[in-house]
């Protein structure tokens, strides 16, 4: 064969292959947007104009209605699961990505596990709004907040929920040394226990709520050590300790409840909500006296109403402890 002819044929083959590669690349770039319906594109474009993700429908002190849930409903109805996965993983708007991920959670699709796994690698900041509260969070933590926010409403299989929880526990929180606390409520699975003990023995009081859930008598000394250090550090009742005792009101921890509550009410400004869990966990003369002080407090912004509302709600489904009964009958039951 003539060398020139052979050379021309080689160039022709290379040219054809190049066109095929470029063509397929172009196809992959346009394929996704071409697949989306007009309704889905409108919803997606709406998210692209959002500066924050609205977790709740009402936003701000005035409860201004956010339309983001409407956009989400439209996106959910006009996309497939595969399209939502692609949006959640690749969209240029992190607000749109979070919403696609949230929709996947509500659909309880197992592909949400891989979406969350990828999200945990992203530290770009994004703004979240819920009611009157707003915060700017790294994307990975925002993804955890979205999951936790909808938590009880999600119709996830036990296996999928456990997989997501474990991914967050080991893939984010353990890697971070639990520096931001637990961020969500974990069930006391055996698989977490060794890590929980390891963190507790390091003196990490952020782990207290989960450690208490195991209700292991062998952990009493370990928990008391953490409570003692926590009280010394905080000086008053802390969220971690309060949550731990709410999970396990063992008599061995009553000393903490008493000391923390007494220290808290000595503060010039405190919120009764912070100590009501502890007071009700240990019905005793000391807690009776503090509860009475709260219920009889005067002033426009007193803790009295907070205490009454808390007690009324708490004792809807359980008997009032005998020692609290006179206070309940006088200050709560008669005040409808």
What is each stretch, according to the model?
Residues 29-243, 248-262, 269-273, 305, ...:
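Extended repeat-based scaffolds of very large eukaryotic assembly and lipid-transport proteins
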Residues 188, 283-286:
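Alpha-helical structural elements of signaling/regulatory helical domains
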């Amino acid at each position: 064969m003539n060398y020139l002819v052979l050379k021309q044929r080689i160039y022709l083959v290379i040219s054809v292959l190049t066109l095929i590669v470029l063509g397929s690349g172009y196809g992959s770039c346009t394929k996704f947007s071409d697949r989306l319906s007009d309704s889905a594109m409108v919803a997606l474009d709406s998210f692209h104009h959002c500066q924050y993700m609205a977790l709740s429908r009402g936003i701000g002190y005035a409860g201004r209605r956010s339309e983001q849930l409407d956009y989400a409903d439209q996106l959910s109805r006009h996309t497939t699961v595969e399209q939502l996965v692609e949006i959640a993983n690749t969209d240029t708007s992190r607000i749109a990505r979070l919403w696609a991920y949230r929709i996947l959670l509500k659909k309880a699709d197992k592909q949400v596990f891989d979406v969350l796994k990828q999200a945990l690698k992203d530290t770009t900041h994004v703004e979240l709004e819920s009611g009157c509260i707003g915060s700017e969070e790294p994307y990975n933590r925002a993804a955890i907040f979205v999951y936790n926010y909808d938590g009880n409403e999600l119709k996830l299989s036990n296996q999928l929920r456990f997989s997501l929880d474990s991914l967050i526990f080991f893939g984010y929180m353990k890697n971070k040394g639990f520096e931001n606390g637990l961020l969500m409520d974990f069930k006391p699975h055996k698989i977490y226990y060794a890590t929980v003990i390891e963190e507790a023995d390091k003196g990490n009081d952020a782990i207290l709520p989960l450690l208490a859930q195991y209700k292991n008598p062998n952990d009493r000394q370990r928990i008391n050590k953490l409570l003692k250090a926590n009280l010394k550090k905080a000086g008053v009742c802390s969220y971690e300790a309060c949550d731990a005792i709410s999970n396990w009101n063992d008599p061995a921890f009553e000393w903490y409840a008493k000391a923390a509550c007494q220290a808290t009410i000595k503060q010039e400004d405190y919120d009764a909500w912070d100590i009501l869990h502890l007071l009700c966990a240990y019905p005793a003369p000391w807690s009776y006296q503090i509860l009475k002080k709260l219920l009889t407090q005067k002033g426009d912004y007193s803790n009295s109403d907070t205490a009454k509302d808390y007690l009324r709600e708490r004792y809807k489904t359980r008997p009032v402890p005998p020692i609290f009964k006179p206070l309940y009958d006088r200050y709560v039951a008669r005040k409808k």
